[in-house]
Amino acid sequence: MIALFLLPVFITIHTIIAIWLFKWLRHIHVVFRKRLVIGIIIAIYTYFILDMYIAALIPHGKLERMMKLIGNYWLGFTIYAAMVVGIALLIRLILVKSRFKDSRFVKSKKVFILNGLLCIVIIGALCIGGHINATRLITTDYEVNIDKSGGEFADLDVVLVADLHMGYNIGVDMINQMVDRINDCDPDVVLIGGDIFDNSYESMDDPEGIMEAFKNIKSRYGVYAVWGNHDIAETIIGGFTFPSKNKKMSDIRMDQFLEEAGIKLLRDESVIIEDSVYIFGRPDEERPGRGIDIRLTPAELVSTMDTQKPVIVLEHEPKELKELAKAGVDLHLSGHTHAGQTFPMNLTAKFSFENPYGLKMVDEMPSIVTSGVGLYGPYIRVGTKPEISNVHVHFR
């Protein structure tokens, strides 16, 4: 639904930015006052605004992929251009309305040009720096205690990854980097908390190469996954979706990909490791997937297991945490939030989720939310880091 409202907002923002830009360019050089030059700039600027929408309408292929990548980066530019130019215009307005309104400083052409250059440098630094930051994966360690016997295990080393968003932004290089970090942790088990794909199987540039990377994961007791809200086949624009009356499900090739890569998909079901520790995989609440209309409640899912043994729940989004804790779940692992992904959303994420990021105790149950390996929309992270989470679980 958000995608339907994105275009008018996009156009309004860029109209304001364009007015500011042309005013600034006219101060730079007289060539930017010529109609032909202005027309060329307007045409290029208009293309970038419409790029994401055009890409959503054309068939899958190299052209569509290139346009989607351009659109994603342009969306990131839009976010920071709107912020920086908006702040610059607000400061100028305050000065104009203040006692400095007649000051040469406020009216100076040189100051206006320097102000514009500063805005461009800041926007560029945020976009370029944010992109570089988004490509550098880190490992975050957690220590968790569960007051139950672990049976065969005194400790269990769990690596949690989520939000890979394999597709337009994330490809073989990032997945190889992820696999290397996973193997460095020497895990007992690897859990993938959904949003493995980015709404389209075709968006991956090298599915076979990515699959081979997954096969290199070294885990003593296997790799398990759940689906997230992006693990379905649907049209997206800048990470936002269109409404549909039809039930949205994963592309069958996504299911086959996991199977061939050696990843076990958990669909409202559990596995037990060495008859000692349960791992239960919950479907996504809004998009539970093929063959599931309504997922099990916390009480229902716990009733399928022996709660004398440790129960770890893996799901995409950190929801119903209090209910899960009350039902007897010992550890909850999830993703989805991206820790806000980029400034300023990283500051507001805490108002949107029960646990926006990291380790949070919900009654006696630890909840761990990872910021994710990949991202949706613009390939930019400012104020957050892409990560894998290395969770050291200690039993009684």
Show the residue positions of the predicted features.
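Hydrophobic alpha-helical transmembrane segments in integral membrane proteins
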Residues: 113, 123-150, 168-173
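Short amphipathic alpha-helical coupling elements at transmembrane boundaries
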Residues: 65-69, 144, 159, 180
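Glycine-centered secondary-structure boundary/capping sites
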Residues: 29, 99-100, 138, 262, ...
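Non-catalytic terminal accessory segments
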Residues: 1-135
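Soluble catalytic domains of enzymes that build or remodel membrane lipids, polysaccharides, and related
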Residues: 148-396
